[in-house]
Amino acid sequence: MTDGGMTKDAIGAGALAGEGLRAFFERDAITVARDLLGCHLTVDGAGGRITETEAYFPDDEASHSFRGPTKRNGAMFGRPGNVYIYRIYGMYWCLNFVCHPGSAVLIRALEPETGIAAMMERRGTDMLTALCSGPGKLCQALGIDIEINDRLLDLPPYALTPSTPVPIVAGKRIGITRNAEAPWRFGIQGSRYLSKPFR
């Protein structure tokens, strides 16, 4: 049973689509961030198991949605299960999944499982644990950029398959200065595929 009162079996065993996708994401971002851990994400067939996430809310000063909709963050106010992609430092893309409008989950890391050769080529490394160990690295490995922003996760090139529950650790979010004490970063306990260890 998830924190939102819904079993993952009830959501469906295959890739999330249609009403199943909406039901999974139309919950608070903390619940979704926890339930995304262990889920299998692919982009054009390359991907793996999500190992680390962060939750963001409209009333959260660290969130892009805090000051309301803009041209840049419009996708964050889309339907549950919508993809919101943005760039940091003028270089690195970051992948987020929308929950309630203005709430989203940042995908920080995953454990590579499929399309590994393509990911290694994009990243320029054969170190498996370093392929997707951070939001920018993850997007580079999966070939994610603004061209596949603002579309639902049941549309190509995305596929997201639910998982059975996994052991979870929580801690402070990374790289923010506002609302920095909120323990809204989540990871699979014991995973080697994280952006940074939990302390």
Curated annotation (Swiss-Prot):
Signal peptide: none annotated. Keywords: DNA damage, DNA repair, Hydrolase. GO terms for biological process: base-excision repair. Its EC number is 3.2.2.-. One of its GO terms (molecular function) is alkylbase DNA N-glycosylase activity. InterPro entries: Formyl_transferase-like_C_sf, MPG, MPG_sf. It comes from the Bacteria. The keyword rRNA-binding does not apply. It is an enzyme of class 3 (hydrolase). Belongs to the DNA glycosylase MPG family. PANTHER family: DNA-3-METHYLADENINE GLYCOSYLASE. This is Putative 3-methyladenine DNA glycosylase. It comes from Rhizobium etli (strain ATCC 51251 / DSM 11541 / JCM 21823 / NBRC 15573 / CFN 42).
